[in-house]
């Protein structure tokens, strides 16, 4: 190799370990010539330089490591070590790994439990195959054709007693952590060499020693010139349940929009119509048209164009669930899948299909979300980015999102237009050419909007910053979310501090300190979910209007609790767990957990409220009465008496009807009619909060090691400090691009710090530790209760509402003329009583008036420092900020609440509701304002059901359904009848999604379906319909349904303000009576 440069700076975005094979010959001890396949691992880094050119850095051979843990009391002394190393060496598969230098004793601290440093065996392998073969041979695992026992070690220790660490840690993660290099970010190299042969399609390719590569700090705020493109397809699909698999399916158009403002259009059309179509579209030289005679040529041309662009990322809208699925299905049918997948930069490594969960093997179903995993080119779904970032959008169609974020949208092209063009693909008349130009423009605009949305919201910057901070590949950050990021992050920290990170929990989960009960069903006959700890503290507000309300918040409560109390895998243990440290080294934390038991405050309050209605029932001679609210709109759909939940005992009274409120209660119950109504509603709320039959009644006690700092506190403290530094640096940066990078960086630090707590509580996660999760939650409850008590005791400030880490306090005359200063002083006083570094912060907003309706449900109006109030209201947890209500219902609710904040009377409130309801009945509300959206999950093929072992329920995709009594017979003979049965058991939105597929409509984007509620005559008919289909085929909107939708939410407002639950029903009663008369007349004359 020739040296060609002393080094450069590159932005790395994709690391890959390539497994290479080489056949070598050798002679055994008997002199026989034998052939050996040598497998090695080679590391590559795909980068771009400062000009945006793609670069591949080949860093030579790397090794993957494994740690072996022997039983706790097994000493690896010199007497045993020689025999142990010989046994381990014999179990190694690869010849090059059979050397003493590859097998070493090392001292590491165990991750779980308060234990001191122990001795482990570290073994390096030249291939992943060799590492897996070694593990199987030592532990005795094998396939069914091989009979193999575990290895035997001195003093009766067998291989199945050993535990392996780093067995699931990717090789590139091990290498990059050891070399202190980022998964994404700027790096600086030493001397670069020109390789003898090229392995990639990159613009430049070098060989470099990984020891001469380091992270670049001088270019941290320099925006990387990443070239990207977005793509979209148009296809004729006959069966949307399995797109692309039908013999008559066909992909006939693909568009590509590149970040350098150029576009490509690949389509099936008559030869020579490209230029004419560009003129019809009004496109210039920025658009290149590729005309293909058939579908195979189109797929091959798509592959050729993608490779010629030289982009580092390809993205689309909903490509994982539609475009990639269709392309792969068509390529498989046309026998060109290998060529299609050759979309990456590597010449010697073909692309592969991977699910978004990371599976690259086995058969993929049409319902699997997949992407094309290729070296050097990231495959991203922009819709998934928006779903994870903007979780409250009512729908995720490209048309809606682009209108909301870009202020523009695509031209409306109907399914009829698309099907007509497909039927006339090879025609060259004026009508076909005009239609082809319209559809082509529609397809190109789809790609342009997708690319613009990604650039507008800086999603690539968000992904790269999160990848850099958490040491996780960009693709993994995009698809696999929190647990995988925490696994990579914890591995990096463990490797840096000499901790043996456990990553295999399949054989003995007791080492994770979970202390779980038996899960085989023998100890849990009734299939109830066993609780291990209770949740955060919530103080419910008393519904009503409050003046002058301030808010306090525990800043990063769970992360700072981990720092304050040294909470970590290696410091928190059960009270009776063994430890290498003595008792004086521990801090004891004790508390009680009560969920669903007789000590649960919710249970106590529920029993008290039930006794009121039971006493009333006795006066009425044990007449069957209900506990539901007073109006008929709160009545249950069935009068069948059911227990409140599985925990309560049988009661003679579990209902309360309207008529009883007008009777005279017994003398011992001095409650008004309104109080009884509120008690009934409160009883219903408490019922909804019951634990679903699960019970927890326990005194908890854990020990926390004080003498050694844990990994999690250090990690969380680093992230919080780094975020403060980045936020401070943002104030001094004027460049918008650099400021955008810093903003995404500080957000990544915040999200990661808050994710640490959540990852410990995930029982089936990558690194579970419920001892940490439960003590953190308990200390959080203690902290917020202590803060409420301090505010009341020291400053006479009462707390109206508290939830997890926040407090809403009532400000009285003591706040004076400057309530902001008073709240800040209150926060500082509470902070002085808490353990450092915990801080209570005063929110900047003081509300002049707040309407509290319930838990996480309140509306406020801000107070400005000049004494004026905001014209806008802050909405929290009410229907105006939820996705499952129509715009009309939200508008009615918003107008009515605004009248409440304008100090209207109850009659004025009723008049506002009546006017809005009358507007609807007079058909002065557009269909678009009546449209609702709802989430739709996977329904599979609507015939195949599986048994969920956790709940022992039959599942149709993601929905629970009853099994048909003749399922097996119908599945093989009459699948249509079976499909009709199971679809009828689905919720209405899911049934509508199936109907759309049967009609040949495109797949639902973003998993949310848009529909109208319509009037039906047959109860078995579907009461909802997709809006475009409704406009084409007609129907009657069920306007009464929308009026009923406003009754419950506004009744809560009326109860909170005027203590009346009949206000709203009184306002809409004339409308309801009018509708009833109209329907009777329709029945009489029709």
Swiss-Prot record:
Q: Which InterPro entries match?
A: DNA-dir_DNA_pol_B, DNA-dir_DNA_pol_B_CS, DNA-dir_DNA_pol_B_exonuc, DNA-dir_DNA_pol_B_multi_dom, DNA/RNA_pol_sf, DNA_pol_B_thumb, DNA_pol_palm_dom_sf, DNA_pol_type-B
Class of enzymatic activity (EC top level): transferase
One GO term (biological process): viral DNA genome replication
Keyword GTP-binding in record: no
User: Does the keyword Transferase feature in the UniProt annotation?
Assistant: yes
Pfam families in the record: DNA_pol_B (PF00136), DNA_pol_B_exo1 (PF03104)
Give the keywords, sorted.
DNA replication, DNA-binding, DNA-directed DNA polymerase, Nucleotidyltransferase, Transferase, Viral DNA replication
Gene3D superfamilies named in the record: DNA polymerase family B, C-terminal domain (1.10.132.60), Helix hairpin bin (1.10.287.690), Palm domain of DNA polymerase (3.90.1600.10), Ribonuclease H-like superfamily/Ribonuclease H (3.30.420.10)
Q: Where is this region: Disordered?
A: 638-657
Catalytic reactions on record: DNA(n) + a 2'-deoxyribonucleoside 5'-triphosphate = DNA(n+1) + diphosphate
What EC number(s) are associated with this protein in UniProt? 2.7.7.7
Q: Name one GO molecular function term.
A: nucleotide binding
| Protein family (similarity comment) | Belongs to the DNA polymerase type-B family.
Q: What job does this protein perform?
A: Replicates the viral genome. Host DNA polymerases cannot substitute for the viral enzyme in this process.
Question: What protein name is recorded for this chain?
Answer: DNA polymerase
Q: Which organism is it from?
A: Heliothis virescens ascovirus 3e (HvAV-3e)
